[in-house]
Amino acid sequence: MSANITNTKKVTLLGMLAAIAYAVIFVCHFLIPPVAGFLTLDVKDTIIAIAGFIFGPLSAALVGVVVAAVEMVTISATGPIGLVMNILSSCCFACVAALIYKRKHTLKGAIIGLIVGCLSATAVMLLWNFLITPIYMGVPRATVAAMLVPVFLPFNLGKYILNAALTMLIYKPIVTALRKANLLAPSSSDAAPVQKKQHLGTILVSLLIL
């Protein structure tokens, strides 16, 4: 798909997606209170995953790094540690999902990619919480270890499931709008009745999750 568009359009679209992802963080930062005092919930990884589904995992990583860097110097109080955490979180979710979708460019591939992305990102964040949170928060590691299952696991897994459901819900409408605006090349599968029925089922499942 990316081979059929100009580099200018690609850079423009990636910039737009990065700006939208940051706007999502900004809104969530002021509307959603932290969980357990420091765990922040946002859906920026939805936009980053969409960038990866359109352009590939490297583009998802680029958007993730840019968004995390801008977040660090504007609204985040976690500094370089938060920067690394946000990059790891976004890349483990969005890049893994995009890589699988790139290799299996079907609805099934997208679903599998998002599921694997949810699981891999959750696992990495649990390890991060166990290793880094005691240092960052200045609390005993045993205290953090006791929070892994009752606090960190449901929070992280729920966060990535939410992002995955939103990705499945809005990816197709966004891509369709971009193609109508001639910012993306048309796809021969857009008009396939079977694919439309599959997309309708995906929408219903995503809404149920939400």
What function would you assign to each model-found segment?
Residues 1-210:
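Loop-helix junctions at membrane interfaces
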